[in-house]
């Protein structure tokens, strides 16, 4: 069943055939919920002795864990350890008698090709703004219930290609399944912990999370890589013109 969800997610042509945004976003949201439910359905048969199972498809990684003994923090990571989510146990009231179940999910998706999710934040930006959703999503659910954290926050790490953006260029977002939109209330971008290839977020609840780049359309247009590439291409074009002109002059 996880493989079926993976195939659906990877069907770029199929997503592009859904022209109604609300239907497309609802379908995407249903996939996220379906994957979580798969994890809890699987763990319903687990004995509670700290068992961990990992399921990996082309673009979805599902991690399920049951545990009684509580460490200070439980972390889950993507298959390449590039994306991480850490849950502080001090922020949640666990029952010593019941088995605690964690379901964590990692998604790789090319949203610029499939448009599975909106590229804007609810009530703040619009589809016309120059925003882009990072192609990695992270999800976590505990005991299949709504968890609101107060004393400590969930920590998320997203690795990505180098970006040259100010703080306004990266926003930590979470998926609002009720509104079928990205929201940022309750999530904060950590400028101190983040780097050019790393975005760190802190959030006060559990759901599916992502990162929105170039949130205000303020990306630096003079990125050194793009500048170098443009210089090389322009130089080659100029050289080609000179060679062509010389060839034409010699053949007259």
Model-identified regions with their sequence ranges:
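A generic "cationic amphipathic patch" detector
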Residues: 18, 61, 185, 213-214
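Extracellular GAIN/GPS-associated region
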Residues: 1-170
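Homeobox/homeodomain signature
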Residues: 128-130, 177, 219
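Short amphipathic alpha-helical surface micro-motifs
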Residues: 121, 136-140, 180-184, 191-192, ...
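Proteolytic-maturation and junctional protease-sensitive modules
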Residues: 147-212
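Hydrophobic alpha-helical transmembrane segments corresponding to the first two to three helices
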Residues: 193, 202-207, 211-252
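Intrinsic disorder
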Residues: 2, 22-25, 150, 166, ...
